[in-house]
Regions:
Chain A
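Active-site hotspot residues in diverse enzymes, especially metal/ion-binding acidic/histidine motifs
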Residues: 1-249
């Protein structure tokens, strides 16, 4: 499949999710709104970024919660490719290295990159940034882009190399002091950190609604309901932990 | 030899090979000796319900599917080599499949209940 087809697919998914073809998107909110999809945060090994399970009736994305939030967003976009465009296996386990692995994985990474940073919008943005930086992309522009699209440094560098806006050599230098470079420009560091400790194991979305429904309809006992929640790492819902003081504003 | 054991062994071997796991990977995951996995695959040894349950979540199939003879389709696809998956990742795969299987269990409960409601009307 060529890049144009992958771009078209990314565009189609943006449309499906109710997004225009140029703005930054909130992938955590968007994936949570997909019918029948559960998202699981789980600390995985260092080579794995995520997993997509296409079940008989519903689907599950698992995201490596030890990766930075920016990288987690890229993985969510990558798993969307498996969900919508990978017809073969029911379970895909995905590599952490962007642009590596088999053909499907490389396509899924390209799709993720286009979904988050649509080619036309990115080109325009790069032009604008270059106008105010003597025609070259520097670390400042890289930080701007990763903050604008809320995505990891690695994902931005990968794309800028592809777009021939950065050399491998220049990109390499930008792979260090990531947090400091963002802080120095006045940004918050949340993007560069993993999920908070109390949310590294957690299931969101469809699964929780299903559990509530089967309990409400009397289709499972309270004991079974609690077991289902505990197996999905939602002890907070069983024991009432972690509920912060509510503010209505 | 027990025909059911042979069927289960054949099924286990097929699923394991499709997923690219070795007998040793399965043995580590089940915390048993590799020779036991080999014997189970040959239908020479029985399997505990606990092991059956753990294998079903590792492969993301129901226990019933594990006990039926045919493997209908590929169940797992890895973009990484088995050596890139560490021991804890087998637990991870199993935990995530558990969630997917639970989702199917809950959905099937709802479907059955809705069918029963329709039949009563």
């Amino acid at each position: 499949m060529n890049d144009l087809n992958i771009w078209k697919r990314a565009e189609r998914i943006r449309k499906l999710l109710g997004e225009d073809s140029s703005s930054p998107i909130d992938l955590f909110a968007l994936t949570n709104s997909i019918n029948g999809l559960s998202i699981v945060n789980y600390p995985m090994g260092e080579n794995i970024s995520g997993m997509c399970v296409k079940g008989k009736h519903s689907n599950v994305f698992a995201i490596n919660s030890l990766m930075t939030l920016g990288r987690q967003r890229f993985t969510l976009a990558h798993e969307l490719f498996h969900l919508y465009y990978d017809n073969e296996p029911s379970t895909s386990i995905c590599l952490k290295n962007i642009g590596a692995g088999n053909e499907k994985e490389i396509q899924a990474d390209q799709f993720a990159s286009y979904l988050i940073m649509p080619p036309l919008a990115l080109t325009e943005m790069i032009q604008k940034l270059k106008e105010s930086s003597s025609g070259v992309i520097t670390l400042n522009e890289v930080v701007f882009l990763e903050q604008y699209y809320q995505i990891s440094r690695q994902a931005v560098l990968y794309r800028l190399i592809q777009e021939r806006e950065l050399s491998h050599q220049d990109a390499e230098k930008m792979r260090q002091n990531i947090i400091q470079s963002a802080i120095n420009l006045g940004y918050d560091d949340t993007l560069y950190k993993p999920s908070p400790l109390n949310k590294r194991y957690r299931t969101y979305g469809h699964y929780i609604k299903l559990a509530e429904k089967v309990l409400e309809k009397g289709l499972v006992s309270r004991g079974k309901y609690e077991e289902l929640l505990l197996e999905a790492f939602r002890s907070d819902l069983v024991y009432g932990e972690d509920i912060d003081e509510e503010i209505l504003d | 030899m027990d025909k059911a054991l042979i069927n289960l062994g054949t099924k286990l071997k097929e699923l394991r090979e499709q997923a690219g796991f070795t007998q040793s990977n399965i043995a580590n995951f089940l915390k048993v000796d590799q020779s036991l996995v080999s014997k189970i695959e040959k239908g020479e040894r029985s399997i505990t319900t606990d092991m059956l349950e753990r294998l079903s979540t590792l492969f993301g199939v129901s226990v019933a599917t594990l006990l039926t003879r045919y493997v209908e389709e590929q169940t797992m696809s890895y973009s990484l080599r088995a050596k890139d998956i560490d021991t804890n990742d087998y637990e991870m795969i199993s935990a995530i499949h558990r969630i997917a299987l639970n989702s199917d269990f809950m959905t099937e409960k709802l479907i059955t209940s809705s069918k029963e409601d329709n039949d009563h009307e």
